[in-house]
Structures are given as structure tokens and as C-alpha cells.
Design a protein with these regions (language model features):
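Membrane-interfacial segments at transmembrane helix termini in multi-pass membrane proteins
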Residues: 131-150
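Alpha-helical transmembrane segments and their membrane-interface boundaries
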Residues: 1-69, 113-121, 136, 150-158
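Hydrophobic transmembrane alpha-helices of secondary-active transporters
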Residues: 20-28, 78-86, 107-108
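Membrane-helix interface "capping/anchor" motifs
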Residues: 31-36, 85-97
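Alpha-helical transmembrane-segment detector that highlights a single hydrophobic TM helix
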Residues: 62-85, 89
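Alpha-helical transmembrane segments and their membrane-interface exit regions
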Residues: 77-80, 125-135
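Hydrophobic alpha-helical membrane segments of integral membrane proteins
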Residues: 94-99, 117-122
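Interfacial segments of multi-pass membrane proteins
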Residues: 29, 98-115
Length: 158
């Protein structure tokens, strides 16, 4: 049976919420000039939301069906996020961006399945972690670099 106008409106609202909850995370990654940003994050969220809504629209969805939807989603988003991870000679970068892509996919699915409260928490915690823990991470890395320059192996060699 085709969806009603009311159902289409509700679906549009859900996808808009998923999009909006991903924007702050995408903005943060874009501002930091990361490989994924303002376009990627909302697209992942809205696609994940749409997939969850499609899965919920089956005549008699079972727990097993929901499980398979989530398994496929997590695998696919992991592949997308893996593209953000770069390995150089002695460093790895992009792990926070990759984890954020994965988180935004789950956020979108949460909205699609109707778990708004989970989506809001995922969005807020992800954004705050990126926004406020990044300066601490930089300070820790500077401490390690200073210790190496002094000839020690760690900051604890003092």
C-alpha cells in the first residue's frame, strides 16, 4: 500500500532531524579540514535514517530482520569511515573522523527507528568530544614531542 501524505510528512521530518543532528559534527570536521565534513556527515545520517525507515515498513518486521538491517548498515558505514583513516610513516590520522562517520550512521538509524533520545545523545556527545577534547589531545602530543627532544622516551622521564 502506498504511503499517505501524513506518512510522507512524518518521514520527511525524521530525515530532516537526522540531517540536522549530523550538521554540528560535519561542521566540526569541515572546520578542522578533515577528509569528511559538512556534506558527508548529513548524507550518511539521512541515508541511514532512510534505510531504517524502509526496514521498518515491512509488513511484519522481526527482531531478526532489524538485526540484519543494522548489521548491513554498520558494515557499510565502517567501509565509508575506513576511507577517512590515513597511515603515514609513524602516525595514523582520521580515526576520530572515521568513528564520527560510524556514529552518525547509527544516529541516523536511531532516528529512523524512532529512538530520538538516543540520536540526540549520540550527536551531542560526538560533537562535544570533537570540540573540547581536541585541544587536550594536542597538548598531550606536544608533551610527547618535548620529551623526545630532551632525549627521553616519554613525559614521565623527568
Amino acid at each position: 500500500m502506498p504511503p499517505t501524505i501524513e506518512q510522507i510528512g512524518q518521514d520527511m521530518i525524521r530525515m530532516s532531524i537526522a540531517y540536522a543532528l549530523a550538521l554540528p559534527i560535519g561542521w566540526n570536521r569541515e572546520r578542522e579540514a578533515r577528509s569528511a565534513g559538512l556534506r558527508t556527515f548529513p548524507i550518511v545520517a539521512i541515508a541511514s535514517c532512510g534505510l531504517a525507515m524502509l526496514g521498518s515498513s515491512f509488513a511484519n518486521p522481526t527482531a531478526d530482520a532489524y538485526s540484519r538491517i543494522l548489521q548491513g548498515l554498520v558494515t557499510g558505514i565502517g567501509f565509508v569511515g575506513g576511507g577517512a583513516i590515513l597511515r603515514a610513516k609513524h602516525s595514523v590520522s582520521g580515526t576520530a573522523t572515521a568513528a564520527s562517520v560510524w556514529n552518525v550512521g547509527i544516529l541516523g538509524a536511531a532516528v529512523g527507528f524512532g529512538y530520538w533520545h538516543i540520536a540526540v545523545v549520540l550527536s551531542v556527545v560526538n560533537f562535544l568530544t570533537l570540540q573540547y577534547l581536541t585541544p587536550f589531545k594536542r597538548e598531550i602530543h606536544l608533551g610527547f614531542e618535548r620529551a623526545k627532544e630532551r632525549g627521553g622516551d616519554s613525559m614521565l622521564d623527568d
